[in-house]
């Protein structure tokens, strides 16, 4: 196999031997790749600082002659995203984004859109000096755009119950399992026990709709939401991906919620038992 040259984002890694390390990278043309880096763990390794998670790099690698792994030949650091490592909130948000990409991205599969999404997210998270709220909005936007790219965009124009076109309203009912909104007619019908449904404001709906279509290229494109509405749409995005991607337990809502622990609760409940179940699940 001839050497391959790709832009890449480091997704993480694991020690392989006393002197080597395996890193996982996201590439635009070949998706997730596992590269063995020989000599990476030596005290004076030339790779020090180059293999850190989040780094944007240029790599040259080729297939191992004796195994299934790729062997890293050269690596050039393009952007280290040092601002992310300097902020606990930014580091947390970036870690969540990377874990989600690792979960959905497959090896040897063209992933240009996912690569660009993660690159844009890291760029904005790295340069953001506006605090926790902006980072939370970036992460919410990232989640909905990710869902759209993997074919799980929610239905926000037609009712998931009857297919009727939705009219403008102050609030909507978002059905988690069904993956979309109910019209006023279907919303009037009683919910079945155990149904997971959330109240979504028109402002929050606009954020979800825009996020599914494109990721912002600047912080200024984000429209702030009141805290309660942000918590709700944040919680819905977590639960939506949990359910529809059947995420691994290590990516559960509990472990990927914001460090402050803020959680918006399901607002449509059918019994005391259902209420207890929903609250425990969050």
Write out the residue ranges for each language-model feature.
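Non-catalytic alpha-helical scaffolds and adjoining flexible linkers that form interface surfaces
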Residues: 1-282
């Amino acid at each position: 196999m001839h050497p391959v040259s790709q832009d890449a984002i480091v997704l993480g890694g694991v020690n392989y031997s006393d002197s080597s390390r395996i890193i996982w990278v996201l590439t635009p043309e070949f998706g997730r790749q596992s590269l063995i880096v020989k000599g990476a763990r030596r005290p004076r390794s030339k790779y020090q600082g180059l293999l850190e998670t989040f780094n944007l790099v240029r790599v040259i690698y080729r297939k191992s002659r004796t195994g299934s792994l790729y062997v890293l030949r050269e690596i050039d650091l393009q952007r280290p995203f040092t601002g992310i490592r300097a902020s606990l909130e930014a580091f947390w948000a970036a870690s969540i984004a990377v874990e989600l990409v690792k979960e959905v991205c497959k090896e040897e599969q063209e992933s240009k859109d996912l690569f660009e999404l993660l690159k844009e997210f890291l760029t904005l998270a790295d340069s953001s000096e506006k605090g926790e709220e902006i980072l939370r909005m970036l992460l919410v936007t990232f989640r909905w755009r990710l869902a759209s790219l993997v074919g799980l965009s929610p239905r926000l124009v037609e009712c998931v119950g009857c297919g009727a076109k939705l009219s403008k309203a102050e609030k909507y009912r978002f059905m988690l399992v069904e993956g979309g909104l109910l019209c006023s007619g279907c919303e009037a019908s009683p919910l079945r026990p155990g149904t997971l449904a959330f109240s979504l404001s028109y402002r929050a709906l606009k954020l979800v709709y825009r996020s599914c279509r494109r990721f912002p290229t600047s912080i200024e494109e984000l429209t702030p939401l009141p805290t309660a509405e942000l918590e709700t749409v944040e919680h819905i995005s977590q639960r939506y991906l949990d359910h529809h991607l059947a995420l691994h337990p290590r990516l559960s809502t509990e472990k990927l919620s914001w460090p402050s622990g803020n959680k918006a609760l399901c607002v449509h409940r059918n019994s005391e038992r259902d209420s207890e179940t929903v609250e425990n699940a969050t």
